[in-house]
Amino acid sequence: MISTVSLFWALCVVCVINMARYYSSLRALLVVLRGCDPLLYQYVDGGGFFTSHGQPSKQVRLIGYIWAQRYLDHHDDEFIRRCQRVRGQFILTSALCGLVAIGLIGLAIWH
């Protein structure tokens, strides 16, 4: 029989891998954004997005922009495709993090 602890750790590994994929896709989106829409790139602080002095309010703007699907009216097809990918990975990663939290609570109750 499969151990619940090993299943939990496997879920954690899958979650971390998806977080890395999300981070990579977000970086690629910012590179595309810098080329196709410099004003939006500045609006979301693309240059300082992944730095320690990045502005969280501007980072939340980009996430809100993607979550509300405001990118659908954009003129660049590559940018639209990247935004759809980032949105899908955000939903997947959020769901996996929720499962990890539920699994951790379940393990705390069981053991």
Swiss-Prot record:
Residue ranges that the Swiss-Prot or TrEMBL entry lists as coiled coil: none
Where would you find the membrane-spanning parts of this chain? 1-21, 90-110
Any single GO CC term annotated in Swiss-Prot or TrEMBL for this entry: plasma membrane
> What membrane topology does the annotation report for this chain?
Multi-pass membrane protein
User: Does the UniProt entry include the keyword Cell membrane?
Assistant: yes
One Pfam family recorded for the sequence: UspB
Q: Keyword set for this entry? A: Cell inner membrane, Cell membrane, Membrane, Transmembrane, Transmembrane helix
Q: What is this protein called?
A: Universal stress protein B
- What is this organism's lineage? Bacteria, Pseudomonadati, Pseudomonadota, Gammaproteobacteria, Enterobacterales
Q: Which InterPro entries match?
A: Universal_stress_protein_B
The entry sums up its family as follows: Belongs to the universal stress protein B family.
